[in-house]
């Protein structure tokens, strides 16, 4: 399990990619992280390969997503950490060539962008919410994987 600390929290406040109010067209493998982001994609006809959700926004405001996902997985991931269970499930899901999967988080999904970038293949599009700004869209690259590895090394491991 990795625990968030002040140094990494400060780094994570900066978006990893470009922030959009409305996303441009997206091609290839897509992973969405967060309920509002996923709901926006689905309402615009974009079905992510994997959606990571906790059915809340800003930690406690419920979000209704009426979409029926093809395959659903659940893991626990407490606030402020990346659980081993979440890491293993994301690692597994990165190997599946399927669409319309959901990973439902009991806890909080905010930090799970990190293992998604670590384990999903290069050129995967990752979309997550940047609070009060919009959505961040990035393509996984080797350079981004190295940046994520550094963040993981800076986190406390238990």
UniProtKB/Swiss-Prot annotation:
GO terms for molecular function: GTP binding; kinase activity. Its EC number is 2.7.1.237. It catalyses: 3'-dephospho-CoA + GTP = GDP + CoA + H(+). GTP binds at residues 35-36, 54, 56, 109, 132. InterPro entries: GTP-dep_dephospho-CoA_kin. Pathway: Cofactor biosynthesis; coenzyme A biosynthesis. One of its GO terms (biological process) is coenzyme A biosynthetic process. It comes from the Archaea. It holds the Pfam family DUF359. Keywords: Coenzyme A biosynthesis, GTP-binding, Kinase, Nucleotide-binding, Transferase. The keyword Nucleus does not apply. It is an enzyme of class 2 (transferase). Belongs to the GTP-dependent DPCK family. Catalyzes the GTP-dependent phosphorylation of the 3'-hydroxyl group of dephosphocoenzyme A to form coenzyme A (CoA). This is GTP-dependent dephospho-CoA kinase. It comes from Methanococcus maripaludis (strain C6 / ATCC BAA-1332).
